[in-house]
UniProtKB/Swiss-Prot annotation:
Chief localization: secreted
Localization, UniProt: Secreted
Pfam families linked to this entry: NGF (PF00243), NTF3_N (PF19338)
Keyword entries, A-Z: Cleavage on pair of basic residues, Growth factor, Secreted, Signal
Signal peptide range: 1-3
SUPFAM superfamilies per UniProt: Cystine-knot cytokines
Propeptide: 4-119
Species the sequence originates in: Tropidophis haetianus (Haitian dwarf boa)
Cellular compartments per GO CC: axon; dendrite; extracellular space; synaptic vesicle
Family listed: Belongs to the NGF-beta family.
Record's function text: Seems to promote the survival of visceral and proprioceptive sensory neurons.
The name this protein goes by in its record: Neurotrophin-3
Biological process terms in GO annotation: cell surface receptor protein tyrosine kinase signaling pathway; modulation of chemical synaptic transmission; negative regulation of neuron apoptotic process; nerve development; nerve growth factor signaling pathway; neuron projection morphogenesis
GO MF terms held by the record: growth factor activity; nerve growth factor receptor binding
Length: 165
């Protein structure tokens, strides 16, 4: 990157470094997504390479076909983020055999409630902030979008791959 003497006076070094870092990360992310994206059309799996004009066309096809994107996430990246290190979020490489019970009352052990447990205040930093299912007691698997607990429209991912693929 070259800059003229006029540009050097208007931008601080920190903002320029931040801008360059953002450009590098965006380029790496774009290349990684292009390499990992596989499209299935008419039963034949092909690797899609998008040009600058194609992303809107591909996105429109995905919406019409009901395609849910598959996002690859590194497990170590999730462990490093503080907001994902809560007792309600567990990153695991193995697929669960069945969905976890949504409420404690669904578990037969809790229904007996013969022993009394002492309650004490513990610092629960982000507990419940990233709840997926708050009022439903059944799993919904055919949704591609939903409304989160703050009222924002969000995309529901069909599958998340963790680790090297």
């Amino acid at each position: 990157i070259q800059s003229t003497s006029m540009d050097q006076g208007s931008l601080s070094e920190d903002s320029m470094n931040s801008f360059i870092r953002t450009l590098i990360q965006a380029g790496i992310w774009k290349n990684k997504v292009l390499r990992q994206t596989a499209r299935t059309m008419d039963g034949i799996e092909t690797t899609x390479k998008x040009t600058x004009a194609e992303p809107x066309v591909i996105a429109x096809k995905d919406i019409r076909l009901g395609f849910q994107s598959i996002v690859s996430v590194d497990a170590e990246l999730l462990r490093q983020q503080r907001r994902f290190s809560s007792p309600r979020v567990l990153x695991n490489e193995n697929t669960p055999l069945e969905p976890p019970p949504l409420y404690l009352m669904e578990e037969p052990m809790v229904l007996t409630x013969t022993s009394x447990x002492x309650r004490f205040a513990x610092x629960x930093x982000h507990r419940g902030e990233y709840s997926v299912c708050d009022s439903e007691s059944r799993w919904v698997t055919d949704k591609s979008s939903a409304v989160d607990i703050r009222g924002h429209q969000v995309t529901v991912l069909g599958e998340i791959r963790m680790g090297p693929s």
